[in-house]
């Protein structure tokens, strides 16, 4: 049975170190020109695999390119992790797109549109009442 404390500790360490690697060690214009952050890390119970969820303000194809670039660089990132952290075996890394931020922004935009529409309808009703 996996030790949840150990998994949480390893996840936290990996998140910290991968964040530093993304900020300082990758020479990729696409990654440097777009704000990206690690939103979540999932490490398997045997510490063999790690999914890294990336959130970004970028949209559409740029988001896909960011994830593709990170997955192309995953062996390099794993190599640097191996030099920086003391683990018997560094987990296999997989980068995934975390669409929660984009979905949240989409919901906020819809709510704002609904609020504006309701406000416009209320204004029209008030104008009609004033004219009567």
From Swiss-Prot:
InterPro entries: KH_dom-like_a/b, RbfA, RbfA_dom_sf, Ribosome-bd_factorA_CS
Subcellular location: Cytoplasm
PANTHER family per UniProt: RIBOSOME-BINDING FACTOR A, CHLOROPLASTIC-RELATED
Quaternary organization: Monomer. Binds 30S ribosomal subunits, but not 50S ribosomal subunits or 70S ribosomes.
Task of the protein: One of several proteins that assist in the late maturation steps of the functional core of the 30S ribosomal subunit. Associates with free 30S ribosomal subunits (but not with 30S subunits that are part of 70S ribosomes or polysomes). Required for efficient processing of 16S rRNA. May interact with the 5'-terminal helix region of 16S rRNA.
Family: Belongs to the RbfA family.
Name under which the protein is recorded: Ribosome-binding factor A
Species lineage: Bacteria, Bacillati, Cyanobacteriota, Cyanophyceae, Synechococcales
